[in-house]
Design a protein with these regions (language model features):
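Short Gly/aromatic-enriched secondary-structure transition segments
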Residues: 262-264, 483-485, 547-550, 791, ...
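Glycine-rich, aromatic-lined ligand/substrate-binding cores of catalytic
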Residues: 861-894
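Extracellular/periplasmic, surface-exposed regions of secreted and cell-surface proteins
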Residues: 131, 178, 306-309, 345-346, ...
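Extracytoplasmic gating/loop element in the C-terminal half of outer-membrane beta-barrel translocons
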Residues: 285-289, 429, 433, 603, ...
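Conserved small-residue
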Residues: 247-293, 386, 657, 746, ...
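Short, small/polar-rich motifs associated with maturation and membrane association
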Residues: 1-7, 15, 19-370, 378, ...
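Short aromatic-centered micro-motifs
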Residues: 45, 75, 181, 586, ...
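Helical mechanochemical/support elements of P-loop NTPase systems and associated helical scaffolds
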Residues: 135, 139, 204-207, 701, ...
Length: 1014
């Protein structure tokens, strides 16, 4: 590390010496700069109006020659209030005071920044020090429980898995409900695929400076057609100070699953079956023939304790106070708790922001790259392991007890014969170990995102500036999926017996962005006018290709006479978005603030007649605390009322050519025909299409208030909102005889979201040694459909949400007056002890039979009625401690795992013997479940919960050695515990419909972290 430090320091000061030309024969100023903790390293000491400057060293010392004793010397450092002295009056020791309002004062918004006092929209800004701490591999983990109205549902236990992010609920039926994510001014392409399926995977969490979450139309309308689901602006760290600074952070972690699927052990299973199916009965005899004499915990065999590590190195500084720079590299490696799974990621980030012409001309260059590699394990093996026969030895054995690798690679499976004569029982499928070890699936991805911007402040008219930028986002992913030769899966392939086949895929995506805008910002007395007008052009392009090979020879799998080009087509698509936008901010004495925003978008996803959409908004803010009648109320430091209304649009998630008739060539070899010497392929009839399909549009109304008391020791905000989305994209029935498919995607429907959200931050204790900070946020929300078809038929519905058992049925309905994915179930009957009566339900229509007419619409769905976050930070001297948690109330989950495994009834025709869930002891079900039992409201459970996301503690050693190094040692736990009444694996179900078929359990992580600042 010293070598890196020395090299970086030498390079930086070499450049500095080339750029700084100190005055000759002038007045010499020298001294030290400190804060309340000690020396301030890297503070800028500059003679105002010149390029003459210096930076403080390791002990805070500096020396500078200025033009004369009356020259003005400015001493500044990021995060501190600047101080200016005449050269002759500079004290020997300059004490800098922390500028607590530095990061609070300016908030990043679309295409610029705004002073917090002048902000009219509903925007939540999170600073770096307020983000969740700990061993963070995923960027979304930093946001959990931090922002009112922002719901982050983590993915499953797979390493590198993404998350579902929703801002103020879901407002679309078939289009995307994901927010727009903008990283350093570049909108991030969603769904890059493969190992880059997580759109935030591009970022190293240690590189992030702040988040801004734009929630209402006033703040988000500047992004127009992509902003209906809100916008998350991510700003990465830039160079600060002057002298080069080097930081290192690293961690090691141990992960284990917090719980297993509750099933019986082999001893419990033998006892249970002997009671339910006595040995003398026919079923008992069949069970005995399928039982082994082993005691196998299949879940223990597929899971493991997993290790993870991460390392981050960065260097930053500011050459001559004119070129802030920062560079970082990082690596993270994470084993999965499922064996055979792993995730590796390397990132690099470079940021340079030089300025010229007395800072009138500036450039901003941001380059980010990431490489990731994923070994995937089949998550469905969790359920298979839970219910696979625990009395069976997991391996084929030779007579001497060694493993017989000639049969399905040594892993025991249901079937007949051994070795090459083995015939698999395909009704059962592979054993857990075969499924885990003999399936091969991996992907590696490379991604680059870059942006270059030039900003010119007009000489003589400094209020006017022009900004031009270009951005590029490129992803390339190579994937592989197949099975090992000799495996159960390969033996099941009748066409390529014991050889099988595998598929290689290639996915490439590219997003190109060009933007230009002008900004005019002028202040006349108590009046301030800020005008922005701009143009944006974006092209998104994708290419996908999959090729199938023989496993052993790696030869392309072709039919006689075929070519690879004819069999394996490359699918390409693209779209364009052209936009004009503008914003006007006008304030009077920072008391009355008006904002008007408009954006016009033209999208190639729609026909010419519907291509352009216009999205306006307006907002007003009244800073009541600045009114004269508030004078003397010293307890009130902030009180601001906000009103806004506006329109945003939605074009994502609907395909690129939905307004066109799309004909497709079949690549099925059985759909080719020979006529003489010529061969012909099927041309598939297009699906029905609507040439006048148009934008989904959302109108949002927001009323909010920001407040602060006791010099901002207590701050907070409260917002009430209503979002009306119309022209929902919905799939409707096509009349018979149209010669199209039977469904049509068109604009029919509307949905309303409304809610109240609040956030509170308090500092109940602040002394020289002690600091206690508390944060709490919460959101009450509801969502209902207000229209779903053109006839205003309130009985119209859309079925969705299939179960793992049952055939042809759906559990959820979309219906006017109800929330999305409302459960549609049978009402279970119970005995006098409260136990469910198997296959008995309430006859709601009174016809004497249990039919489809006895199902009813519940008032329950997976959308929480209230969700919240809790954050606590405590410090004493150099010690720090904190924890973060989040939870929800009024969330209902259908336990599909319980529904599918609620009876001990057996079907032995498949030739296999399953394990039993512990649940069967509770239900007492012995007969086969009826079709209605799978859909019983008995399995509908309250999944309200509180999750302790992380607990961490650390100690900082300050100003160590000749480099003045700060070292922080910390330890923490993530996913500490969950408080819930839900009986399933985890109350946070990733599927939006709330159907829980069990999943790869989210791990608990124990970590140790080291941070070093040179």
């Amino acid at each position: 590390m010293d070598v890196i430090r020395n090299i970086c320091t030498a390079l930086a000061f070499t450049c500095l010496s080339c750029l700084v030309l100190p005055a000759q024969g002038g007045y010499r100023v020298e001294g030290i700069v400190v804060d309340r903790f000690g020396p301030v390293i890297g503070a800028a000491v500059v003679e105002q109006g010149t390029s003459t400057g210096a930076s403080t060293g390791l002990e805070g010392e500096y020396a500078l020659t200025v033009s004369g004793p009356s020259a003005l010397v400015e001493i500044s450092c990021i995060g501190y209030a600047s101080q200016v002295f005449e050269a002759a009056l500079v004290p020997q020791t300059v004490i800098l005071e922390e500028d607590n309002e530095f990061l609070d004062e300016v908030v990043v918004i679309g295409y610029g920044t705004v002073r917090k006092d002048d902000m009219t929209g509903s925007v939540s800004a999170i600073k770096a020090e307020d983000l969740n701490r700990g061993a963070l591999v995923n960027t979304q983990d930093m946001l959990k429980g931090k922002v009112a109205g922002l719901l982050v549902t983590p993915g499953d236990g797979g390493p590198g898995s993404g998350a579902r992010i929703r801002i103020r609920g879901s407002a679309s039926l078939n289009a995307s409900n994901d927010p727009l994510i903008v990283i350093d001014g570049v909108p991030v392409a969603q769904g890059a695929g493969g190992a880059m399926s997580n759109p935030l995977d591009l970022l190293n969490p240690n590189d992030i400076e702040s988040f801004s979450v734009l929630k209402d139309a006033s703040s988000a309308a500047i992004y127009g057609s992509r902003a209906s689901n809100g916008v998350i602006l991510i700003t990465t760290k830039k160079g600060i100070g002057t002298a080069p600074q080097v930081t290192y952070s690293g961690s090691v972690s141990l992960q284990n699953i917090s719980r297993k699927v509750p099933v019986m052990s082999s001893a419990q299973l033998r006892e249970f079956y002997s009671k339910v199916y006595p040995p003398g009965t026919a079923t008992g005899v069949s069970i005995a023939s399928l039982m082994g004499d082993s005691d196998t915990d299949w879940q223990d065999l597929i899971f493991r304790k997993a290790f993870a590590t991460e390392h981050n190195v960065s260097i930053y500084g500011n050459l001559n106070n004119r070129m802030p720079y920062r560079a970082s590299i990082a690596y993270s490696g994470q084993e999965g708790t499922l064996r055979e799974s792993r995730y590796d990621r390397g990132t690099a980030d470079i940021s340079i922001s030089p300025s010229f012409l007395d800072k009138h001309l500036s450039f901003d260059v941001n380059l980010k790259g990431v490489y990731s590699y994923s070994d995937y394990a089949d998550g469905s093996v969790v359920g298979r392991a839970a219910f696979f026969n625990p009395t069976i030895d997991p391996y084929w054995r030779n007579s001497d007890g060694t493993i017989d690798y000639t049969t399905t690679n040594g892993y025991w499976n249901y079937g007949n014969g051994r070795g090459e004569a083995f015939i698999p029982n395909t009704l059962v499928g592979p054993s857990p170990l075969s499924q885990l070890y003999d399936n091969i699936s991996y992907a590696h991805s490379s991604r680059f995102i870059g942006r270059m911007a030039a900003d010119y402040k007009v000489h003589g008219l400094e209020a006017l500036r022009f900004n031009v930028s270009a951005g590029l986002d490129i992803t390339a992913t190579d994937s592989y999926n197949g099975v090992r030769p000799g495996s159960f899966q390969a033996c099941s392939d009748t066409e390529n017996l014991a050889i099988g086949q595998h598929t290689k895929g290639r996915h490439v995506s590219r997003s190109t962005l060009f933007e230009a805008y002008a900004n005019y910002n002028e202040t006349w007395g108590i009046h301030n006018l800020d005008i922005t007008a701009g143009y944006s052009w974006q092209n998104n392009w994708w290419s996908d290709r999959d090729v199938t090979y023989f496993n052993l020879t790696d030869e392309i799998k072709l039919e006689p006479g075929e070519t690879a080009e004819s069999r394996y087509l490359t699918y390409r698509r693209e779209n364009y978005l052209v936009s004009f936008y503008g914003r006007i901010n006008y304030s009077v004495d920072s008391r009355y603030v008006f904002t008007f925003t408009a954006r016009s978008d033209g999208s190639s996803k729609f026909a010419k007649e519907q291509r352009w959409g216009f999205f306006p908004s307006g907002a007003f803010a009244w800073n009541i605390a600045r009114e004269p009648f508030m004078d003397g109320l010293d307890a009130v430091s902030e009180l601001k009322l906000r009103l806004s209304a506006g329109m945003t649009g939605q074009q994502d998630g609907i395909g690129d050519y939905v307004h066109l008739a799309r004909y497709n060539l079949s690549n099925d070899p059985y759909h080719t025909y020979d006529m003489g010497a010529a061969g012909y392929m099927d041309m598939l009839t297009p699906q029905a299409y609507d040439p006048l399909i148009r934008w989904e549009t959302t109108v949002t109304y927001n009323l909010g208030m920001d407040f602060g008391f006791f010099k901002d020791r207590l701050t907070g905000s409260i917002d009430a909102y209503v979002r009306d989305t119309k022209d929902l994209l919905n799939s409707v029935q096509v009349p018979m005889g149209s010669n199209f498919g039977n469904r049509l995607m068109t604009n029919i429907g509307s949905i309303r979201n409304k809610g109240i959200e609040f956030s509170l931050s308090g500092i109940p204790l602040q002394t020289e040694r002690w600091s206690v900070q508390l944060g709490l946020n919460g959101t009450f929300q509801s969502t209902v459909f207000t229209k779903l078809n053109p006839t205003e038929d309130d009985n119209y519905y859309i079925e969705t949400g299939g179960l793992s058992r049952g055939t042809g049925g759906y559990l959820c309905r979309q219906m006017v007056g109800y929330a999305p994915y409302t459960y549609y179930t049978y009402m279970q009957k119970y005995d006098s002890d409260g136990k469910p009566l198997q296959n008995e339900f309430v006859d709601l229509d009174g016809d004497g039979a249990i039919t489809e007419g006895d199902r009813y619409m519940t008032d329950k769905s997976a959308s929480p009625a209230f969700f919240y976050g809790l954050n606590v930070k405590v410090s004493y001297g150099d010690w720090d401690f904190g924890f973060n948690g989040h939870g929800s109330e009024g969330t209902w989950v259908f336990n599909d795992f319980a529904s599918a495994n609620s009876t001990s009834s057996l079907d032995l025709n498949s030739g296999s013997l399953p394990n039993q869930a512990q649940l069967v002891r509770k239900t007492g079900f012995r007969a086969p479940n009826s079709a209605q039992q799978w859909y019983s409201d008995y399995f509908l459970e309250d999944a309200s919960f509180f999750r302790m996301d992380d607990i961490n503690a650390g100690y900082t050693f300050r100003n160590i050695g000749k480099w003045g190094t700060d070292i922080r040692l910390a330890a923490g736990v993530q996913n500490v515990f969950v408080l819930t009444r839900y009986s399933g694996m985890d109350p946070e179900v990733l599927s939006e419909n709330g159907i829980d078929g069990t999943m790869w359990p989210r791990p608990r992580t124990w970590s140790f972290r080291l941070n070093v600042n040179f």
